[in-house]
Design a protein with these regions (language model features):
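Hydrophobic alpha-helical transmembrane bundles of multi-pass membrane proteins
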Residues: 1-404
Length: 404
């Protein structure tokens, strides 16, 4: 019976890992659909390279920093050979170490790819690649160690079941730093500083991406049990209810606020609910999940407006609001509604992770800006990154209207 349970755990964790991997396709579709056609190929390349670089650098360095030893702040063993961390039977945290490693790898790549959309349409490809490697080496693994690797936050009882904090808030705050440092797209703001809408070129692609992400989120949250347990259905229910509540509330808020139900904002509402419930999906009941999702559905609308109109940070896909703000919201709500969780502990974790992430991300992007540069030239941005960065177009033989 014990061997059967281990095999079931292995199969379930691998299924979860495969679903989380496919979230890369969801992010690629959302980001491509919400931006202009002339930059589609560049966005697809960035999403692919997030997974490629995340896989390699997390294997070589990141996994050791995250899970190598019981130091409260940083892992200290397993560099370049993470499988050396396994016990004599090749097991790690109750699973064969290869199974555990691939599951953690896809989570790392998910955090990295959140930044792509926020910096879309004006960022140098080489600079983005360096960022993508860096987050997989020393940003995500360090805070991940604090939360999931036996570090100081886990020791004081901080709860982040599937990554509202460790994955989404970290990625969202890196997106905030990156979007601020690279600056807004040409034509995003008038001379008076008023924001100008720059519509995405393909809402059907964006919708497909949202559906893919919603589907894969069941692997993200339910798979985080890393075991075939009886509470999988409960986790799936809280995940789905939060997303549904957030979507409906965002639709209503935009309908009232703008006079019509906004399509792209409503899609982001679904993602906001999923992000917000990810920390607490295992420790809240169904109605608490609905409430968390509903609040996220309101917050995401006003967060997008705040960054767009008040602080004037250009985020083409709303990644900062969806992942950064709603990740923080989910972190704190876990302390209010989560069974056995403590608000002060969650607040401490939020502040610590936010401070570390923002400081490191701003330093990284500042260095890139002052050395090789973060931004493409004005001509490259106006013409489109596909042709200038990659020498081809995602839509061959189509004519684009290139405006500023």
């Amino acid at each position: 019976m014990e061997n059967t349970q281990v095999l079931l755990n292995i199969v379930w964790t691998m299924v979860g890992a495969f679903l989380v991997y496919f979230m890369q396709a969801g992010f690629a579709m959302v980001e491509t659909g919400f931006t202009r056609a002339k930059n589609s190929g560049n966005i697809l390349m960035k999403n692919m390279m997030d997974f490629v670089l995340g896989s390699l650098f997390f294997f070589i360095i990141g996994f050791a920093l995250m899970f190598g030893g019981s130091n409260a702040f940083i892992g200290t063993s397993g560099f370049f050979n993470p499988k050396a961390l396994a016990d004599a039977d090749g097991m790690f945290n109750g699973l064969p170490i290869g199974v555990f490693m691939i599951f953690q790898t896809v989570f790392c790549a998910t955090s990295a790819t959140i930044v792509s959309g926020a910096m879309a349409e004006r960022t140098k490809f080489i600079s983005y690649l360096i960022y993508s490697a860096a987050i997989s080496i020393f940003i995500y693994p360090i805070t991940g160690h604090w939360i999931w690797g036996g570090g100081w936050l886990s020791q004081i009882g901080f709860h982040d079941f599937a990554g509202s904090t460790a994955v989404h808030m970290v990625g969202g705050l890196c997106a905030l730093a990156g979007a601020k440092m690279v600056g807004p797209r040409i034509g995003k703001y008038t001379k008076e500083g008023n924001p100008v809408a720059i519509p995405g070129h393909n809402l059907p692609l964006g919708a497909l991406g949202v559906f893919i992400l919603w589907f894969c989120w069941f692997g993200f949250n339910c798979g985080s049990t890393t075991a075939a347990t009886y509470n999988l259905g409960d986790i799936a229910m809280t995940t789905n209810l939060a997303a549904a509540a957030a979507t409906l509330v965002t639709l209503i808020v935009t309908w009232v606020r703008y006079g019509k139900p906004d399509i792209s904002m409503t899609m982001n509402g679904a993602l906001a609910g999923l992000v917000a419930i990810t920390a607490s999906c295992d420790v809240v009941n169904d109605y608490e999940a609905i409430f968390i999702g509903a609040v996220a559905g309101v917050v995401v609308v006003f967060a997008v407006e705040f960054f767009d109109k008040v602080v004037k940070i250009d985020d083409p896909v709303g990644a900062i609001s969806v992942h950064g703000v709603c990740g923080a919201l989910g972190t704190l709500f876990t302390g209010i509604f989560g069974e056995g969780c403590n608000f002060i502990t969650q607040l401490i974790g939020f502040v610590a992770v936010a401070a570390y992430t923002l400081v490191l991300a701003f330093i990284l992007f500042f260095i890139l800006k002052k050395t090789i540069g973060l931004r493409v030239t004005e001509k490259e941005e106006v013409d489109g990154l596909d042709m200038h960065e990659h020498g081809c177009s995602a839509y061959a033989n189509f004519h684009f209207h290139n405006d500023k």
